[in-house]
Regions:
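ALDH superfamily catalytic-core signature
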Residues: 2-145, 173, 207
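Conserved C-terminal structural/oligomerization subdomain of aldehyde/semialdehyde dehydrogenase
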Residues: 30, 84, 127, 134-207
Length: 207
């Protein structure tokens, strides 16, 4: 969706208010040490695994402040093991099928590139249906901005986890991509929320 997003600019200026075009994303969730961690984990899970990650504003990047990194990873690892993959029409299902064979291949290729570049892959241990296009909910740790999974849109149930020390480092790293659709901020400090909202290059910021 990155390439088509350039086309509207060739059509001339749009009349009226500036438009927002939903043409792809690599949304960042930024998790500070003072955030309610359990609540944040649920938000992160919903943000990336809802609809198999087939959402332009899916929170496919997670920046965790270093002081809580180990705690967050443990909770995230435990939580994704409870996700159920299967028939999307079953009310007990959390993750449905990937939309096509081609998209499944793209997800696999990008995840493998992350592993090849040194990231560590964690996936659910649930059994996948034998028929159809399925990918287990996953997250990658040890990710740096040099990794493809940190900057390319995967459009699947895959989360790239990175760390930061300061708010300045967080928004600089979050902004270091060509997308600007959405972002999320997790903290219990209102002043920090407003600071991050003003610094993040994202059209929509949830906090």
């Amino acid at each position: 969706s990155t390439r088509p997003s350039c086309l509207p600019r060739t059509w001339g200026p749009a009349p009226g208010p500036k438009p927002t075009l939903e043409l792809g994303g690599k949304a960042a969730n930024i998790l500070f040490e003072d955030a309610p961690i359990d609540q944040a984990i649920e938000g992160v899970i919903a943000g990336i695994y809802f609809n198999q990650g087939h959402v332009c504003c899916a929170g496919s990047r997670l920046f965790v402040q270093e002081g809580i990194y180990s705690t967050v990873i443990k909770k995230l690892r435990d939580r994704i093991q409870t996700l159920r993959v299967g028939n999307p029409l079953d009310k007990n299902t959390d993750i449905g099928a990937i939309n096509s064979s081609a998209q499944l291949q793209k997800i696999r290729e990008l995840v493998q590139s992350g592993v090849d570049e040194g990231a560590e892959l964690t996936q659910t241990q649930c059994a996948l249906p034998a028929k159809g296009y399925w990918f287990a909910p996953s997250f990658l740790t040890g990710v740096t901005h040099a990794h493809r999974v940190a900057s390319e849109e995967i459009f699947g149930p895959v989360l790239s986890v990175m760390t930061f020390r300061t708010p300045e480092e967080a928004f600089e790293r979050a902004n270091n991509i060509p997308y600007g659709l959405s972002a999320g901020v997790w903290t219990d400090k209102g002043s920090k929320i407003f600071k991050m909202v003003n610094k993040l290059r994202a059209r929509v910021v949830w906090a």
